[in-house]
């Protein structure tokens, strides 16, 4: 990194819940265990507006530079880096874990996690996020991307992506973690609920890329039809089916029976769906030794068919985000063209237009990035 450059432009929140401002701040320095990344594009989560205005009540310290998953280039290396090189294109994995306590986890720039260790990490060394020209990132959270494969022209064997397109990896890697944890295999059948949100539709896309048949289960039939249309480039006839949630467990089970045997159920439902009939119905529809991935946002306990789970040897697997190994596995799938990124170019916004970016992501659900 050029030594003459001392300051950078960054979004900054002084007080929790207050509007962000663009400030000139000192560029961070690389220290042991860290990398300085020049941010090319930082992802805007669909509900990011309600994170930083305080409505979601996500815990995080202030003052803070917001921003989470991103793509950028290595600008400066810490003294203990052995494989990364200045100029390398990297995906910034926002799931930061303690090095001496891997159960201490927080989401970079967004959420301080659920342990004292996670809070310590976010309040200290790794407080500031990616809505800035430069960001200080743990070495292990910088996943290299093969730029020639991903961004090279199709005539030369590349995939033809723009660098900002690669931010979509962040959306796809979340459900990839849950699907890998339940060992979804090619040719198997998985129920995905609810498939119409950002991460739900990503789960459908990822499961298809993994070679599974998907039953997309949602409340709104017209939105399910939209999912089918969106997934057309990623599938073929017979690999994506839909079931509309009826409100009756018995009816839902009956509607799922035609697709048996069903190997797995992936749930990423929001808290608003906590009383939905689909949850119990999907579990009841699984084959012997079926698996359940729980990645949803339920804040209260939900009833489960205990007897059936016991007698059918059903496995329940909770997953929060994904592991470092899974990040690299997912990137390899994308580099080889098996896991395709969003079919449309991301909407780009400057730092000053952060409010417009948040609103656009919130109202459209489409891929949105801030380009510092």
Residue ranges and their predicted role:
Residues 220, 298, 322:
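Residues in the short beta-alpha loop(s) of Rossmann-like NAD(P)-binding domains
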Residues 26-43, 55-107:
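Glycine-rich beta-strand-centered segment in the early N-terminal region that forms part
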Residues 236-238, 290-293, 304-343, 366:
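Rossmann-fold dehydrogenase core element
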Residues 88-89, 134, 189, 209, ...:
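Residue-level marker of beta-strand positions
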Residues 97-191:
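NAD(P)H dinucleotide-binding glycine-rich loop of Rossmann-like/cofactor-binding domains
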Residues 2-6, 177, 277-280, 324-372:
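C-terminal hydrophobic helical "lid"/dimerization subdomain
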Residues 182-184, 208, 215, 224-225, ...:
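Glycine-rich cofactor phosphate-binding loops and adjacent beta1-alpha1 units
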Residues 152, 156-247:
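Mid-domain Rossmann-like dinucleotide-binding core that forms the NAD(H)/NADP(H) cofactor-binding site
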């Amino acid at each position: 990194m050029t030594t003459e450059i001392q300051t950078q432009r960054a979004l900054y929140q002084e007080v929790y819940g207050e509007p962000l401002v663009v400030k000139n701040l000192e560029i961070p320095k690389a220290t042991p265990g860290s990398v300085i990344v020049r941010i090319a594009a930082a992802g805007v989560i669909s509900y990011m507006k309600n994170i930083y205005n305080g409505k979601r009540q996500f815990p995080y310290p202030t003052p803070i530079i917001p921003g989470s998953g991103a793509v950028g280039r290595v600008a400066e290396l810490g003294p203990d880096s052995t494989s990364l090189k200045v100029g390398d294109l990297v995906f910034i994995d926002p799931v930061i874990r303690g090095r001496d306590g891997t159960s201490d986890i927080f989401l970079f720039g967004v959420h301080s996690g659920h342990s004292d260790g996670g809070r310590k990490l976010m309040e200290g060394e790794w407080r500031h996020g990616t809505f800035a020209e430069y960001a200080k990132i743990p070495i292990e959270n910088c996943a290299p991307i093969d730029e020639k494969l991903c961004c090279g022209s199709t005539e030369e064997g590349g995939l033809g992506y723009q660098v900002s397109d690669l931010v979509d990896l962040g959306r796809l890697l979340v459900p990839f973690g849950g699907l890998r944890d339940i060992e979804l295999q090619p040719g198997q059948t998985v129920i995905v609920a609810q498939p119409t949100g950002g991460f739900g539709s990503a789960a459908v896309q990822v499961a298809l890329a993994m070679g599974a048949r998907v039953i997309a289960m949602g409340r709104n039939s017209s939105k399910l039809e939209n999912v089918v249309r969106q997934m057309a480039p990623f599938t073929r006839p017979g690999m994506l089916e839909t079931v509309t949630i009826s409100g009756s467990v018995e009816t839902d089970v009956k509607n799922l029976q035609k697709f048996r045997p069903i190997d797995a159920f992936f749930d990423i439902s929001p808290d608003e769906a906590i009383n939905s009939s689909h949850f119990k119905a999907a579990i009841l529809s699984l084959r012997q030794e079926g698996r359940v991935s729980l990645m949803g946002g339920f804040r209260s306990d939900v009833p489960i068919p205990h007897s059936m789970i016991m007698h059918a040897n059903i496995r329940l697997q909770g997953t929060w985000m994904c592991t470092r190994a899974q990040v690299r596995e997912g990137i390899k799938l994308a580099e080889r063209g098996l896991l395709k990124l969003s079919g449309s170019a991301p909407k780009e916004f400057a730092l000053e237009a952060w409010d417009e970016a948040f609103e656009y992501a919130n109202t459209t659900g489409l891929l949105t990035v801030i380009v510092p």
